[in-house]
Each structure stands twice: as structure tokens, then as C-alpha cells.
């Protein structure tokens, strides 16, 4: 709905503002949830509850300082950022100033999420994320509409619409922080009671704790910063390359909007699931590393990669098969042909991002923190060369960005996989992890395409055709993966509602054990 309100040009400004916001958020505090969960889990595994509580408190101070400092920089430096880096996106300073306090809110929220994850509970994080997205979606639409109405005579009308979308981001984050704050208030007596019963007196000083936080968070920040830099570099190269070809600013902003707020937005949904799996894996993996249980480490890594592939393959195939119908359904007023083609040709990035995300989490958990950074830098260098070459010497236009978005995680995947294999001395099982999900997804894709086309020919309505197509997609993939023994009963239990799914599977004789 927001795309229909502010248009592709407004979404281009919105996406460019978020590129800046994301990289500054990463620099200030993005790595805190993972870092805090890793440090808290390590302390709790050794029953050092006083140390775990101190890690949390010092991490919170660090987040408040770094998040506050970066928020002030964005608010007062928004005009300079627009003039220096985004001259083609007029008015981008408006949504940037709205996003400035969001950096501070997310910094504090990230530390609270890291605490709960380190305590091996993902529920507060999951609920807060759902609340955040609901508030974000509702407020973004309402705020975009009212701000565009109030500034209808402004030359920066699209920028005001983009600012409305960022208001939703701010209030969504604030609502999630309020929820986590309430949970922490209820949970704090338990933390203090554990700390009082702990007979181990921490020997570390405040300086030692801050050093530990920095050495843990900096590699995570650098790794994520490199990834986010690829987005900003893409926007910058694309901007200059298109200007050099004589393309006007409106067309540039529109194409950038389609790429960022349709293609990247849709592929980011399954990628977010992979990120959540990687985040939930870290505390448990750190505990095994702390106790030196190498068998448990290998088993957990194997399962994390397998679960990611079970989700990533059908997501990539499904988005490719239903690319144009999904774009037309979600963004009816926009260019669904270009957006659909981007999604169709670039959905394979989901598989590579899923694998690179989980393997980066593994390397960080086993204290090989510098390797994901090095791999990301190597991949970024290759990515820049590929994107620049395609934009400079071919007529691919925005599709060069799509191609680059596939090559970046592909290189990281290869380098991470090699390092995980060397450091842990094992090879990932191939048939059930990769071959079964791939084959099941291909068959699922064929069935989904046939069902969609049949229903669309009869009804001529996208929503009438896409619903049965999605039902067939889910049912066929579920049946094929189980029938081909891609998942055992015990593995199925690890999924949400896994026991209920096993009951359904038994009725259709899909499980062999």
C-alpha cells in the first residue's frame, strides 16, 4: 500500500535513506544482539552469573553511547549526506532526520534481545519483532498519506512520503523496545537472584569488559558493514553510470525504488528467517564450544545448515515461479514487469544468503571472528568489479544490481564453507541437505506454475489463482521432502508445530521411521 501512496520515486528515496540508516546502525550497534548473546551464553555455561549480568550492563552502556552518538550525527549531518552522496535523491535529508532517533532506539533494543537470546529464549525477541513489524506497517501507511497530503505543494513531495514510511520504522522500534523493557523489568529479579547466588567473583574490571565487548562486536560490525557497503556502493555506481548515459534523475530513482523496495524487499523475507536461525543457533553453539564438545558442535552446524536449505530452496523457486503475480498483487500501481523480471532472475540469492549467513554465524561462534570479515571484503571487491563492468559495458541497467546481489553471497558462501570445513574438520552431508530440497523445489515449482495458470485462465483474477497455487506449493514440497527422506521424524519435531506436522505426515504415510 505504501508504494501505491508514495510511488516508485518516493520508494527510491526511501530505500536510499535506509541504505544510509542501515550502515550507520551497523557501525553503532547492529552487532550487539549477536555479541551479547554470545558473551552471556559463554558466561552462563560456566555458571558465572555475575559476569553475565555485568556483560549485559556494560553492553547497555556501550549501546546507549554509540547509538546516541550516531543518532546525533545523522540528525545534524543529514543535509551534508544528501549533498555529498545522494544529489539525485532530492529531499533525502527529510527521512534521514526521522530515522536518526531510530538508531538510538534499536541500539538499546538490540542489547535487550541479546540478553534474552544468551539465556536461550527467543520468545521475547520473536514477539517484539512481530509487534515491531505490525506497528511499522500500519504507521508507515498512515504517516505517508498524511505527510504527503500536508506537503502536497512541496517540491520534495516524494521525500515527505518517504519520511512517513520512516516514522513507521521509528514507532515500530519504539513499541518493540517498550515491550522488551516490560519483559526485562519482570525478569530482572531472576537475574539479580542468580547473581547473588553465584560464588564466583568476577576478576575482570570495567575496562576488561569493554575490551571484551569491543573485540566481540567489532568483527560482527565489520562483516555486516561490508555487506551494507555493497548496497550503498551499488546505489552510487548505478547513480553515476545512469547519469553518464543521460538518464534523468526520476527514472534513476524509480529503477532504484523497484530494485530496493520490490526485489530486495521480497527476497529479504526468507533471508530474515535464515538470520533468525543463525542467531538462535549461536548461544547453543557457544555453549558447546565452551565445554569442548566437538561432536555436539558438528551436529548443531549440520542441522543449522540443513534447516536453512529446507527453507531457502522452496523460497527461491517459489518467488521465481510466481514473481510477476506476487509483484502485481502487492504493488498493483507499479511496474510489475521490471520488478517481476528482477525477482525471477535474482531469487537464487536467497539460497546463497541463507548459507553465507549461517556459516558466518558458525565461524563467529567458534571464535574465528575475523574470517567472515575477510571473506566479505574479498566478496565486496569482486562484487564492485562485476557491477561496475556490467553497468559500464552492457545495457543491463538495474539488472546489473540483481546479478551483483547474487554473486556477493555466492563468493562468501564458498569462502565460509571452506573455512568451516577446515576449522571443524567435517564435511556437510550433501544429499539430504541440498539434493532433496532442490529436487523437491523443482517439482513444487512445476506444479505451482500449472495450478496458477489454470486458475488464472478460468478466473482472470490474480488473488483467486495465487491462493490455490500457494496451497499446492506448500503441500507438495512438504510431501516430497518427507517422502524422499529429507527430514526424519526427530528433525521434523525441531520445526515450529513439528509434532502436528508429523501427525499429518503419518496420515498420508510420508514418514518412513
Can you name each region flagged by the protein language model?
Residues 30-45, 271-293:
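Helix-loop junctions and terminal segments of transmembrane helices
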Residues 80-99, 302, 320-350:
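Interfacial segments at transmembrane-helix termini and the short loops linking adjacent helices
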Residues 450-513:
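Membrane-proximal transmembrane or re-entrant/amphipathic helices at the cytosolic face
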Residues 1-34, 64, 71, 75, ...:
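Signature of the first transmembrane helix
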Residues 2-23, 90-91, 158-163, 209-216, ...:
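Interfacial/gating helices of multi-pass transporter permease domains
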Residues 123, 134-183, 370, 380-417, ...:
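Membrane-interface helix-loop junctions in multi-pass transport and translocation proteins
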Amino acid at each position: 500500500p505504501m508504494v501505491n501512496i508514495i510511488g516508485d520515486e518516493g520508494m527510491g528515496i526511501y530505500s536510499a535513506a535506509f541504505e544510509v540508516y542501515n550502515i550507520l546502525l551497523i557501525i553503532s550497534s547492529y552487532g550487539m544482539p549477536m555479541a551479547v548473546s554470545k558473551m552471556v551464553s559463554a558466561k552462563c555455561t560456566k555458571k558465572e552469573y555475575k559476569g553475565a549480568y555485568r556483560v549485559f550492563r556494560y553492553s547497555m552502556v556501550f549501546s546507549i553511547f554509540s547509538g546516541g552518538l550516531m543518532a546525533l550525527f545523522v540528525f545534524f549531518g543529514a543535509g551534508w549526506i544528501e549533498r555529498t552522496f545522494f544529489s539525485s535523491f532530492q529531499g533525502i535529508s527529510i527521512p534521514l532526520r526521522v530515522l536518526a532517533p531510530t538508531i538510538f532506539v534499536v541500539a538499546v533494543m538490540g542489547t535487550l534481545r541479546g540478553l534474552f537470546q544468551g539465556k536461550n529464549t527467543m520468545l521475547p525477541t520473536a514477539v517484539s519483532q512481530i509487534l515491531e513489524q505490525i506497528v511499522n506497517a500500519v504507521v508507515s501507511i498512515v504517516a505517508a498519506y498524511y505527510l504527503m497530503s500536508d506537503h502536497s505543494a512541496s517540491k520534495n513531495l516524494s521525500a515527505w512520503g518517504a519520511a512517513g514510511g520512516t516514522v513507521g520504522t521509528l514507532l515500530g522500534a519504539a513499541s518493540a523496545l517498550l515491550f522488551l523493557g516490560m519483559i526485562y523489568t519482570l525478569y530482572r529479579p531472576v537475574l539479580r537472584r542468580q547473581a547473588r547466588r553465584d560464588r564466583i567473583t568476577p576478576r575482570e574490571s570495567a575496562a576488561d569488559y569493554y575490551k571484551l565487548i569491543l573485540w566481540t562486536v567489532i568483527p560482527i560490525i565489520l562483516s555486516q558493514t561490508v555487506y551494507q557497503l555493497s548496497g550503498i556502493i551499488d546505489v552510487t555506481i548505478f547513480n553515476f553510470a545512469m547519469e553518464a548515459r543521460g538518464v534523468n534523475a526520476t527514472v534513476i530513482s524509480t529503477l532504484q525504488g523497484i530494485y530496493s523496495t520490490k526485489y530486495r524487499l521480497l527476497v529479504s523475507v526468507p533471508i530474515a528467517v535464515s538470520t533468525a536461525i543463525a542467531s538462535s543457533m549461536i548461544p547453543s553453539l557457544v555453549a558447546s564450544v565452551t565445554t569442548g564438545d566437538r561432536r555436539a558442535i558438528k551436529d548443531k552446524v549440520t542441522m543449522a545448515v540443513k534447516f536453512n536449505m529446507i527453507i531457502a530452496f522452496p523460497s527461491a523457486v517459489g518467488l521465481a515461479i510466481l514473481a510477476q503475480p506476487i509483484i502485481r498483487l502487492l504493488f498493483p500501481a507499479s511496474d510489475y514487469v521490471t520488478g517481476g523480471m528482477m525477482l525471477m532472475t535474482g531469487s537464487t540469492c536467497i539460497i546463497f544468503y541463507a548459507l553465507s549467513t549461517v556459516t558466518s554465524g558458525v565461524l563467529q561462534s567458534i571464535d574465528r571472528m575475523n574470517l567472515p570479515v575477510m571473506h566479505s571484503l574479498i566478496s565486496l571487491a569482486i562484487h564492485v568489479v562485476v557491477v561496475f563492468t556490467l553497468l559500464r559495458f552492457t545495457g543491463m541497467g538495474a539488472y546489473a544490481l540483481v546479478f551483483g546481489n547474487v554473486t556477493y553471497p555466492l563468493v562468501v558462501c564458498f569462502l565460509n564453507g571452506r573455512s568451516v570445513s577446515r576449522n571443524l574438520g567435517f564435511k556437510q552431508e550433501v544429499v539430504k541437505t541440498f539434493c532433496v530440497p532442490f529436487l523437491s523445489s523443482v517439482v513444487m515449482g512445476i506444479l505451482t506454475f500449472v495450478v496458477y495458470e489454470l486458475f488464472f485462465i478460468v478466473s482472470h483474477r490474480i488473488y483467486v489463482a495465487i491462493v490455490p497455487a500457494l496451497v499446492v506449493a506448500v503441500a507438495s514440497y512438504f510431501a516430497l521432502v518427507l517422502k524422499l527422506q529429507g527430514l526424519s521424524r526427530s528433525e521434523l519435531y525441531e520445526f515450529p508445530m513439528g509434532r502436528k506436522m508429523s501427525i499429518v505426515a503419518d496420515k498420508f504415510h510420508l514418514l518412513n521411521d
